[in-house]
């Protein structure tokens, strides 16, 4: 029996869905070198510009000198070091919750939390546009799994009325491909009224959102009662690596006992925890980063709308430009790259069919001049793409004549 991998790959290519890894040959930042080409990048999730911050680098270096490089073992054996513990305490205080628990990746945090809380005989309900890790977690948990309409409390309520056992409602805080926010106050009210727990993965909210960078929960003024399970990642707004779950004493102890991705994984390097402690300090202290980022977002949206581009309803650093077809999105990204601009083309199955887009992401490390350069390149590339499509249509009509 053959797996016929060649045919599967050929099909991906034919559908303009084949993915390749760009090779980054520089540090993260607005100005990068990718595959040997200097580019101005608008595709990183380093929203506050902390990934290459000198103080964060110094903290990582000092942590490696003091604690070594590897975690050495799982947290439950001998891998839970001083910096890990200190970071968990700091994240608990930052989120206003009794406890926090570190995970090596956001994917693992989501898998671990969902599977530890629900199983056979229970129910997990998720937004249909949730991140793949959340959807995988629901499917793998063994619980009855259903998706409600995107950001629709009424759709959620209808599914909650049919739920069985312990019920977990799961949503992204900021939707990673659209940039819009979950309607947390309404979702929380619906969940509470029916005795369900709400779990929020705020991977893209921590850092940019909230007065102190506390994310979507701080943005809406909600607490642990409304959102019992709060997930955050450290590789985006924090600029380092890893993830955490914040919640009650009982929640965190339950995860330590039952979350398999936590139990059976080597801890992250303690030096990374040292770096994250410094980035957390900067995230909270330097509010100018959020203010500058908000100004850049407004500048970009104003300029893009003036160009006639189709934007999505987002005031976050994620600013998608809806294109439609996968081939057109890839072509537009290529035209930008020829002008020295790097923006990711996002295609199905990451997004629904016929909704391919350019996913522009802005950072506090960008300048106004760099945003203006992006807008200029977008205008030129969009006109070029429109001319190419018109020429193709005319050629097809000529063939049919």
Swiss-Prot record:
It catalyses: 6-carboxyhexanoyl-[ACP] + L-alanine + H(+) = (8S)-8-amino-7-oxononanoate + holo-[ACP] + CO2. Pfam families: Aminotran_1_2. Pathway: Cofactor biosynthesis; biotin biosynthesis. Its cofactor is pyridoxal 5'-phosphate. InterPro entries: Aminotrans_II_pyridoxalP_BS, Aminotransferase_I/II_large, AON_synthase_class-II, AONS_Archaea/Proteobacteria, AONS_Proteobacteria, PyrdxlP-dep_Trfase, PyrdxlP-dep_Trfase_major, PyrdxlP-dep_Trfase_small. Keywords: Biotin biosynthesis, Pyridoxal phosphate, Transferase. Pyridoxal 5'-phosphate binds at residues 106-107, 176, 204, 233. GO terms for biological process: biotin biosynthetic process. Substrate binds at residues 19, 131, 350. The modification N6-(pyridoxal phosphate)lysine is found at residue 236. One of its GO terms (molecular function) is pyridoxal phosphate binding. Its EC number is 2.3.1.47. Catalyzes the decarboxylative condensation of pimeloyl-[acyl-carrier protein] and L-alanine to produce 8-amino-7-oxononanoate (AON), [acyl-carrier protein], and carbon dioxide. Homodimer. Belongs to the class-II pyridoxal-phosphate-dependent aminotransferase family. BioF subfamily. This is 8-amino-7-oxononanoate synthase. The gene is bioF.
């Amino acid at each position: 029996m053959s797996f016929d991998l060649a045919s599967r790959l050929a099909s991906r290519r034919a559908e303009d869905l084949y993915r390749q890894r760009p090779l980054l040959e520089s540090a993260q930042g607005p100005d990068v070198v990718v595959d040997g080409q200097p580019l101005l990048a608008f595709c990183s999730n380093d929203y506050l510009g902390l990934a290459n911050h000198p103080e964060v680098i110094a903290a990582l270096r000092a942590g490696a000198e003091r604690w070594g490089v590897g975690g050495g073992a799982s947290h439950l054996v001998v891998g839970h070091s001083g910096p890990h513990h200190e970071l968990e305490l700091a994240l608990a205080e930052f989120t206003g919750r009794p406890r926090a628990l570190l995970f090596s990746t956001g994917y693992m945090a989501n898998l671990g939390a969902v599977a530890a809380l629900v199983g056979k005989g229970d129910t997990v309900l998720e937004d249909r546009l949730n991140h793949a890790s959340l959807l995988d977690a629901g499917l793998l948990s063994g619980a009855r799994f259903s998706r409600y309409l995107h950001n629709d409390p009424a759709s959620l309520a209808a599914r909650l009325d049919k739920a069985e056992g312990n019920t977990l409602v799961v949503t992204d805080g900021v939707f990673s491909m659209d940039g819009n926010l979950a309607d947390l106050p309404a979702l929380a009210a619906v969940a509470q009224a029916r005795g369900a727990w709400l779990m929020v993965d705020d991977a893209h909210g921590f850092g940019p959102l909230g007065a102190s960078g506390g994310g979507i929960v701080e943005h809406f003024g909600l607490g642990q009662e409304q959102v019992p399970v709060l997930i955050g990642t450290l590789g985006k707004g924090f600029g380092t690596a890893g993830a955490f779950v914040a919640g009650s004493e009982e929640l965190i102890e339950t995860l330590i006992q039952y979350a398999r991705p936590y139990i059976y994984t080597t801890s992250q390097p303690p030096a990374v925890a040292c770096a994250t402690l410094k980035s957390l300090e900067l995230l909270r202290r330097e509010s100018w980063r959020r203010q500058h980022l908000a100004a850049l977002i407004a500048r970009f949206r104003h300029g893009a709308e003036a160009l006639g581009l189709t934007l999505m309803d987002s005031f976050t650093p994620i600013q998608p430009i809806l294109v439609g077809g996968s081939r057109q999105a890839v072509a537009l990204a290529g035209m930008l790259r020829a002008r020295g601009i790097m923006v990711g083309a996002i295609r199905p199955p990451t997004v629904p069919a016929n909704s391919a887009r350019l996913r522009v992401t802005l950072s506090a490390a960008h300048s106004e001049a760099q945003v203006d350069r992006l807008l200029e390149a977008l205008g030129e590339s969009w006109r070029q793409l429109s001319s190419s499509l018109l020429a193709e249509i005319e050629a097809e009509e000529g063939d049919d004549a």
